[in-house]
Design a protein with these regions (language model features):
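Accessory, non-ATPase domains that flank or precede helicase/AAA+ motor cores in DNA-metabolism machines
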Residues: 1-260
Length: 260
């Protein structure tokens, strides 16, 4: 072998050296022998919540780095069976600690595998994307994000203003009771608007009782906040639609999510 070629090969091997162990959640059934977190090798630590592509048997699947690696997470000597991660979806922000805590609670409560619940909570189409495909999707231009207020506001009635003030007075659940046409939706709109004005990083989740009611409510929210700020997520959408909405919400581009 030419000395120059040998030198290049040595540099590549050094770059790909597995110097860290990652604990990764993958989609396996609770009764499987692989139901817990799986260990993979990586060149460097990755933040918890990072989405990665990992080998699983003869397949390559999506996984989630679950725990921060301990200080002694270096790959022990003499462990050639530790498989390396195949890729990192570095263009996608890690799934935050609150999301991971909710998934862990659901897995314990329903006695399911952690990865089984975690991966099922992500859009189905996301599970098939590699790093290059994800980068291309995120480079696609999205809808412009206008200001929080896009329509002229109507004056609230005394009852509506009272309900709005009570909701802002303290945290906790509230029941807004009123007959059809009494103006409940406008109170919801104002409360969401107040939240988004008060905290530039805040997002609002609005739950709708039925899928067929979503388009009508979405029209109201889009008229108030703009199309780039509002997305819907429900089982009546196609996989590409669900992925597009999820990416907009996860990236913070969409600040309001309508769900069922």
């Amino acid at each position: 072998m030419h000395p120059e070629a040998s030198k290049k090969l040595e540099v590549r091997q050094a770059d790909e050296a597995l110097s860290c162990t990652l604990q990764v959640a993958v989609q396996t059934p609770a009764h499987s022998a692989l139901a817990g977190l799986l260990s993979y090798g990586a060149p460097a630590p990755l933040p918890p919540g990072t989405l990665v592509r990992v080998p699983l048997g003869t397949r390559e699947v999506l996984g989630i780095v679950w725990d921060a690696p301990p200080p002694d997470a270096a790959v022990p000597a003499g462990m050639p069976e530790l498989r390396p991660i195949a890729g990192v979806l570095a263009d996608l922000a890690p799934l935050d600690a609150h999301w991971r805590a909710l998934v862990a609670f659901a897995a314990r409560y329903y006695q399911r595998g952690l990865g089984e619940v975690a991966l099922a909570a992500l859009p189905a189409q996301l599970r098939g994307l590699g790093p290059a495909q994800m980068a291309r999707r995120l480079r696609r231009p999205g809808s412009p994000a206008p200001g929080v207020e896009t329509t002229e506001l109507i004056a609230l009635s005394e009852e509506q203003e009272s309900a709005r003030a009570q909701i802002h007075s303290k945290t906790g659940p509230f029941l807004l009771f009123g007959s059809t046409g009494s103006g409940k939706t406008e109170v919801y709109l104002r409360c969401v608007q107040d939240l988004l004005h008060a905290d530039p990083g805040a997002q609002a989740l609005v739950m709708v009782p039925e899928i067929n009611l979503t388009p009508q409510l979405q029209e109201r929210f889009v008229a108030r906040f703009g199309a780039g700020q509002v997305v819907a997520l429900h089982s009546g959408m196609t996989n590409p639609q669900r992925l597009k909405s999820w990416l907009a919400a996860h990236s913070g581009q969409a600040r309001i999510v309508l769900g069922t």
